[in-house]
Amino acid sequence: MTQNSYKIPIQGMTCTGCEEHVTEALEQAGAKDVSADFRRGEAIFELSDDQIEKAKQNISAAGYQPGEEESQPSENSVDFNRDGDYDLLIIGSGGAAFSAAIKANENGAKVAMVERGTVGGTCVNIGCVPSKTMLRAGEINGLAQNNPFTGLQTSTGAADLAQLTEQKDGLVSQMRQEKYIDLIEEYGFDLIRGEASFIDDKTIQVNGQNITSKSFLIATGASPAVPEIPGMNEVDYLTSTSALELKEVPQRLAVIGSGYIAAELGQMFHNLGTEVTLMQRSERLFKTYDPEISEAIDESLTEQGLNLITGVTYQKVEQNGKSTSIYIEVNGQEQVIEADQVLVATGRKPNTETLNLESAGVKTGKKGEVLTNEYLQTSNNRIYAAGDVTLGPQFVYVAAYEGGIVANNALGLAKRKIDLRFVPGVTFTNPSIATVGLTEQQAKEKGYDVKTSVLPLDAVPRALVNHETTGVYKLVVNAQTQKLIGAHIVSENAGDVIYAATLAVQFGLTIEDLTDSFAPYLTMAEGLKLAALTFDKDVSKLSCCAG
């Protein structure tokens, strides 16, 4: 049997002794040239294909948790036997597309990218970058209007949304040029302008020209979805895209939706001076999160003055001149919400309508998403998909990760499976929400014996000195191993804290590991240690930094 090179992520290694145990376990399965690294949480070795499961069993028997194996490229460069005009043809030009193009180009492949609109995809053009800079502007304006400190007299005039939008557009243009457009020439792959449509599984047509490739990546992203509410198509509603192009601050804004886009943009406009009503069908915001998280952000947004309506049944929407009326029913009572603008933030739909995927034998799901396996292959094994078009976690860092996976798999550089178990997510409200790993409910559904700690934000010294104490830290732990399997935070700068929690979850740190570590005083990161201490102690009875 031929020996192949493998890499396996391994949880639970904490020292050089652990490396020795893992090495011994692998060698007992017949592995050669084993290199175990506890800092990286991985082992690389040579082994025949038929012994890989035995190797993983040995690792488990030694007390560690092996992940999915990845075959590693040989030391020889890949010899491309081109079957078409390109080795890899990418449809789309966002995070997944550029990651795949760069990886493929670095390994000698001939690559082309097809884009029908603006280069750069959602994140830099109409998503992360423009929304977060506008959120920051709103946050500063809101703090000037309502700061929590006595003795400070701060105020603000009317927000000039036209100037803010112009500044935002300048930033977007700069980042699009530097992080996307300039890289096309830097790496030397082809950019083809136009709409791509499959002719067959080897050919697409762009502007009437047929182009062939050995493999394809569909990375066309997603667009705002519009709910089926009577009258919605007859009113001038906003989406997350058009809301960021407004030149005047609306007096009244009604937001349909209960997710991160609804909360972020709703709070942004509130901070700029708009009267905001958030409406959602569910009984609570962020219904997929643990109740403590939903309750904390609900309390904070309500304290700030946003109007939240849950359990909504939408009856119809009507345009009345410059005003829009939303007819709803809540607990059997009919209401009418009047607004100058209506923002629809009810999710996103994949951009697959014009690709003619049937001609290439590519199957899609109920919402039009491209269906893929663990290698990101579609139902046609020469065609891959990555990023938002698959309706997986809709983060640019996930898309970029998946693009790299596709480049490896499509070009035969290494056979890699996707692993999305440890993807952190952040909602950039104030306070922000950050989460990684399993919720309490998810952990129970997976059969874990679960224990949790819930630390109110007023137990975190940084929150006290900020005079902003609405929030919570929640940790989810496997009671049998004491390992952290989930962390969920509502606090200022929660997104800056969650990376530490991500490493803790990914590499199997225990409660004791967290409580025995140093946490800088008067930082939000200290909340992680305090939440870990809460499993065994009442932290309100501890002096500063005592554990």
UniProtKB/Swiss-Prot annotation:
The keyword ATP-binding does not apply. PANTHER family: MERCURIC REDUCTASE, PYRIDINE NUCLEOTIDE-DISULFIDE OXIDOREDUCTASE RCLA-RELATED. Disulfide bonds join C123-C128. The active site is a redox-active disulfide bond. CDD domains: HMA. Keywords: Disulfide bond, FAD, Flavoprotein, Mercuric resistance, Mercury, Metal-binding, NADP, Oxidoreductase, Plasmid, Redox-active center. Its cofactor is FAD. Hg(2+) binds at C544, C545. FAD binds at A97, G117, T122, K132, A196, D388, V396. It catalyses: Hg + NADP(+) + H(+) = Hg(2+) + NADPH. Belongs to the class-I pyridine nucleotide-disulfide oxidoreductase family. Residues 4-67 form the HMA domain. Binds 1 FAD per subunit. NCBIfam families: MerA. The lineage of its organism: Bacteria, Bacillati, Bacillota, Bacilli, Bacillales. This is Mercuric reductase. It comes from the Bacteria. It comes from Staphylococcus aureus. A metal cation binds at C15, C18.
